[in-house]
């Protein structure tokens, strides 16, 4: 009996230890989920500024291409694909937060017209689900269902992202009309250079904060450098801290200028934005167009038949 109680107590302690360890890991691990686009969601009510600039460009300074493909026209209450392509060289490696090299992640923000939103799962076809894969989209804000964000996700697998979109029906949504609408997209690959608070990440170039002579360079145990610069005019010493990641370009005893690069620029990613247009088409207009085309075709057929009949009459009169 005592042995059974002891075994039960040991089992309980082991389970408790595992639970505590798991909680500590979840809290302290460097999760990519706290990266973009959460920064934009926390800092900006709308991801697109009045100038047309998407706010992701404030932290991702390099300009890179992005492409979007949507149908020219869609009917009300239909599901269609918005395909966003974020091209980059898959062989590239980026500097991670710990200074090591790793693969690039990608992310995207899709700004749809009012009324357009993410298609519900039961409206998505199996073919479209296969294109989407394991991606999980979310609204930029609970009250902004027309703005969708995704990422960061592995770039090698998702450099092409398929958004399933549901078009609105003006019959039930009075704010929507049968018009041509713009769609805006922003796509990013790799980490940013600046955090929302204005501080630099380790994925950018570091410049000298003072002119003078490089007196001492100390390599830190966990990576990175402390560079002591002695001002040539007054001898004042300034210490510049370089995080792990960027490669050092200066050496001790070297004379440097203010804002001179102390490191290389390790950034291999960047952000791009683009736009497209889509027409929300009235089904009655489509039906009218089809009726008009059918009437034109019938008129052409009757004209040809009438012409052939006339030619036969002429031929019979000539033979007579």
UniProtKB/Swiss-Prot annotation:
Keyword line: Chloroplast, Electron transport, Heme, Iron, Membrane, Metal-binding, Photosynthesis, Plastid, Signal, Thylakoid, Transmembrane, Transmembrane helix, Transport
GO biological process annotation, one example: photosynthesis
Primary localization: plastid
SUPFAM superfamilies assigned: Cytochrome f subunit of the cytochrome b6f complex, transmembrane anchor, Cytochrome f, large domain, Rudiment single hybrid motif
Signal sequence coordinates: 1-35
Pfam families reported in the protein's UniProt record: Apocytochr_F_C, Apocytochr_F_N
Location in or out of the cell: Plastid, Chloroplast thylakoid membrane
Chain sites annotated for binding heme: 36, 56, 59-60
Family: Belongs to the cytochrome f family.
Name this protein carries in UniProt: Cytochrome f
Organism: Daucus carota
